[in-house]
Amino acid sequence: MTSVKERVAAPSVNFEKILFFPEGIPGFEDFKEYRIFHKETNGLAIYWLESCDDAAVTFTLVAPDHYGLHYDFNLSDEEQTLLQAEEPMQLAIFLIVSKGEGQYAGLNANISGPIVINVQRQRALQKVLQQSRVLTTIIDQ
């Protein structure tokens, strides 16, 4: 079992390679390979995943610290094997962001389902957290 603590200085993601999700993303299990793209806007790094099989299947990602979140969770032995992770320092954590409608209008981050990427092996999974220790920092701007 590997303990994962999200760091401020996460390893950089190689945008020239394909990310492989061995089990897909929950709800999109048939889509296992994704290109990752990156854009910086107003100091915010935004990433998005695009399925190699269907360009209409995309996900927007941000680093958790954008929302003042810092993760501390354990990977199961199975998850560690899927990611081919040997050290926690190989892993980067991202959140899927979606645009809400109605009373939930605006951008919403899925904090209970972070994307965990082994940046050295270009393997990823969505970690569905049942219980987690998420430190939230409220920033007055």
Curated annotation (Swiss-Prot):
GO biological process terms, semicolon-separated: bacterial-type flagellum assembly; regulation of translation
GO cellular component, one term: cytoplasm
SUPFAM superfamilies attached to this UniProt entry: BH3618-like
Keyword Coiled coil: no
Keyword Cell inner membrane: no
Cysteines engaged in disulfide bonds, as pairs: none
Pfam family of the protein (one): FliW
Subcellular localization, as worded in the UniProt entry: Cytoplasm
Gene3D superfamilies (alphabetical): BH3618-like
Keywords: Bacterial flagellum biogenesis, Chaperone, Cytoplasm, Translation regulation
Purpose of the protein: Acts as an anti-CsrA protein, binds CsrA and prevents it from repressing translation of its target genes, one of which is flagellin. Binds to flagellin and participates in the assembly of the flagellum.
Subunit structure: Interacts with translational regulator CsrA and flagellin(s).
Family of this protein: Belongs to the FliW family.
Protein name in UniProt: Flagellar assembly factor FliW 1
UniProt source species: Desulfotalea psychrophila (strain LSv54 / DSM 12343)
